[in-house]
């Protein structure tokens, strides 16, 4: 009987450890896609649910914060985006670093911005929710 109780305790401890561990790659990738989709849809309220209020971004055109991201959202007419080559890494339970390629079709202020971009984000778990705190992307050279 003691043996079975020991196994039950070990199983319980293992399941607790898994539940507080960093999310898997698929869960973070879904959050990443949600951020892109809300940006594409110009859904500022939805965007703020997955991107932290203290967000920072680094792009070829400059440094960005939440206010600038929301302003830039209005200038975009994104037709589509496709994320590929997605990787996620963490050595902390509440931080994830991602890198990926994203193919975008659309315009910014009427100018074509379509292309393939190399991108990366940093996600932080705050109050049980995963929020993007940093993002960067640069157009890939052919």
Predicted regions and their residues:
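Short, low-complexity N-terminal intrinsically disordered segments enriched in polar/charged residues
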Residues: 4-50
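Hydrophobic pocket/interface hotspot
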Residues: 35, 46-47, 55, 69, ...
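Short solvent-exposed beta->alpha transition segments
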Residues: 48-82
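A mature extracytoplasmic/lumenal domain signature
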Residues: 51, 61-62, 87, 92, ...
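Surface-exposed, charged secondary-structure patches
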Residues: 71-113
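Short beta-strand edge/turn micro-motifs at domain boundaries
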Residues: 116-141
């Amino acid at each position: 009987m003691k043996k079975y109780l020991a196994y039950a305790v070990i199983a319980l401890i293992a399941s607790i450890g898994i539940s507080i561990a960093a999310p898997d790659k698929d869960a973070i990738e879904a959050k990443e896609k949600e951020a892109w989709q809300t940006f594409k849809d110009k859904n500022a309220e939805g965007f703020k649910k997955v991107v932290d209020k203290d967000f920072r971004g680094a792009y070829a055109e400059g440094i960005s914060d939440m206010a600038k991201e929301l302003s830039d959202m209005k200038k975009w007419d994104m037709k589509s985006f496709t994320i590929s080559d997605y990787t996620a890494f963490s050595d902390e339970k509440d931080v994830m670093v991602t890198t990926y390629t994203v193919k975008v079709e659309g315009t910014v202020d009427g100018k074509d911005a379509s292309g393939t971009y190399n991108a990366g984000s940093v996600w932080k778990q705050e109050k049980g929710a995963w929020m993007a705190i940093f993002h960067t992307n640069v157009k890939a050279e052919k």
